[in-house]
């Protein structure tokens, strides 16, 4: 093993929490404008991961979720979020090892494709349970502005010949570009070879670089229009749901299903509390209005909007909130019990900045329930 204890703890946490196996921390150098490494200083909280070896990989397999049907090799959410798996000198060996270790699971690598070797296509295509999650972004005029080292020709080669599991487009705020990208993918019959074509929204935080803020705001302003067109013209294309609004039904409907199930669980929790207990629900922007309507008839329950200033890009119902943002924005008049999203905490029970929920309970002198 090459990982020391601190590195292995971070490695283990990323796998067990998010399902990603981070195999190295080398900065990819592609320069994507939306890369978090440029602005998110909290990522320094986690140690860098040297290129792992076979023993590290096999040990990491022990922390994968047995209930999911995939294994992702490469970058993580918090650990090594700015790399490309194909920078690892043993990546092709690792793909083969993972495919044989998990013969019933899909082995995937999330990548822009910039470092994939074309002479390895036959090898990759020979592995029946492997597929690339290709972050295509866009193939239109803005590509080089968003991905300075875009490797356009290599990307086109991958679209034609690589084993693809998923192809992700990033809406840039220009509907014509999405139309052209989807036309291209269907012309190449990528839609027949992938499990999913995904259209997603760009996100930013207060600390993001100006170019990203400009791109992201243009995307946010016109995302509803984009999705309305996609649903009508390409009903099989999936899209991310940044806010629980009816216009976004029909894409990743699991967001709405998860929200309704979460609301039911929260109602059960609230009904089990002593009469008169005042409950504050901590809600991210994505679900605040939806949850507010759901609890409107309960006078002992208040929904509280917490904007995500620390970490951008989360579109889940719970969001990836953190203690820092909660303390800065949540100042209740009454607070017996707080219900916070369980997704705030990693497998070790710590938030993004390494704080346990007991610290928040002490700060607010209130009981915290995950739900």
Regions found by a protein language model. Give the residues of each.
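Structural motif
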Residues: 110-114, 171-174, 241-244, 281-287, ...
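Canonical Radical SAM [4Fe-4S] cluster-binding loop centered on the CxxxCxxC motif
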Residues: 5-56
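Helix-enriched interaction subdomains in cytosolic or periplasmic regions
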Residues: 209-261
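Conserved strand-turn element in the central/C-terminal portion of the radical SAM core barrel
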Residues: 139-141, 158-185, 197-216, 246, ...
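Short amphipathic alpha-helices and their capping/turn segments at secondary-structure boundaries
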Residues: 53-65, 115-127, 156, 182-193, ...
């Amino acid at each position: 093993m090459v990982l020391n204890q601190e590195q292995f703890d971070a490695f283990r946490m990323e796998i067990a929490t998010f399902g990603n196996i981070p195999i190295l921390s080398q900065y990819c150098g592609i320069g994507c404008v939306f890369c978090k490494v440029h602005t998110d200083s909290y990522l320094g909280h986690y140690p860098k991961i040297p290129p792992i070896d076979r023993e590290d990989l096999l040990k990491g397999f022990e922390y994968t979720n047995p209930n999911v049907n995939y294994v992702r090799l490469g970058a993580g959410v918090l650990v090594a979020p700015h790399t490309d798996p194909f920078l690892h000198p043993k990546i092709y060996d690792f793909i083969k090892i993972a495919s044989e270790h998990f013969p019933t699971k899909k082995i995937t690598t999330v990548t822009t494709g910039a470092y994939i070797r074309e002479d390895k296509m036959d090898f990759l295509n020979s592995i029946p349970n492997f597929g690339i999650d290709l972050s295509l972004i866009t193939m239109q005029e803005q590509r080089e502005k968003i991905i300075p080292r875009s490797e356009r020709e290599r990307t086109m080669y991958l679209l034609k010949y690589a084993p693809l599991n998923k192809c992700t487009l990033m809406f840039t705020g220009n509907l014509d570009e999405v139309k052209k990208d989807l036309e291209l993918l269907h012309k190449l019959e990528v839609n027949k070879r992938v499990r999913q074509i995904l259209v997603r929204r760009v996100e930013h935080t207060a600390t993001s670089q100006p170019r990203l803020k400009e791109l992201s705001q243009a995307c946010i302003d016109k995302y509803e229009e984009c999705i309305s067109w996609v649903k009508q013209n390409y009903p099989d294309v999936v899209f991310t749901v940044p806010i629980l609004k009816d216009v976004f039904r029909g894409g990743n409907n699991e967001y709405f299903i998860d929200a309704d199930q979460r609301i039911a669980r929260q109602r059960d929790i609230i009904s089990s509390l002593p009469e008169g207990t005042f409950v504050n629900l901590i809600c991210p922007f994505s679900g605040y209005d939806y949850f507010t309507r759901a609890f409107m008839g309960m006078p002992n329950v208040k929904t509280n909007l917490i904007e995500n200033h620390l970490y951008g890009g989360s579109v889940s119902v719970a969001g990836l909130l953190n203690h820092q943002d909660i303390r800065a924005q949540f100042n209740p008049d009454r607070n017996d019990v707080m219900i916070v999203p369980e997704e705030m905490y990693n497998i070790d029970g710590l938030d993004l900045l390494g704080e346990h929920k007991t610290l928040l309970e002490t700060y607010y002198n209130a009981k915290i329930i995950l739900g």
